[in-house]
A protein has these predicted regions:
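Motif-centric detector for short Cys/His coordination patterns
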Residues: 1-108
Length: 108
């Protein structure tokens, strides 16, 4: 899938990320989901099982940095910043946010 963001901004004092893609899809993705589903190796379990990240309901996005033409890095209020969020990943998170959050809450 080739999707490109036309607009990307943190909103609601950093509690959400709004992304508008070139196919006109607009998503508001909560910071909690972005943090607990971070694509970083330590969260995704590249060196062991996937970690369940707890107590991130009040997490906020501090800063967004563009990585080339394909992704962003998000710096969160807990200092986590090692995940690289590709455009495709953000689109997937936006499209499947409710399901991903339900799965996360069920795992707690």
């Amino acid at each position: 899938m080739n999707c490109w963001p036309l607009s990307l901004e943190k909103i609601d004092q950093g509690k959400n990320l709004r992304v508008i893609f070139d196919d006109k899809m607009e998503f508001v993705i909560c910071a909690e989901l972005l943090r607990v589903e971070s694509p970083s190796a330590d969260v995704q379990g590249h060196s062991g099982p996937k970690k369940i990240i707890k107590n991130k309901k009040d997490i906020i996005i501090i800063k967004i940095e563009q990585i080339g033409n394909y992704a962003i890095r998000i710096i969160f209020s807990d200092d986590h910043s090692s995940g690289i969020y590709t455009w495709e990943l953000l689109y997937n998170y936006g499209k499947n946010q409710q399901k991903l959050l339900k799965n996360y809450y069920d795992s707690l």
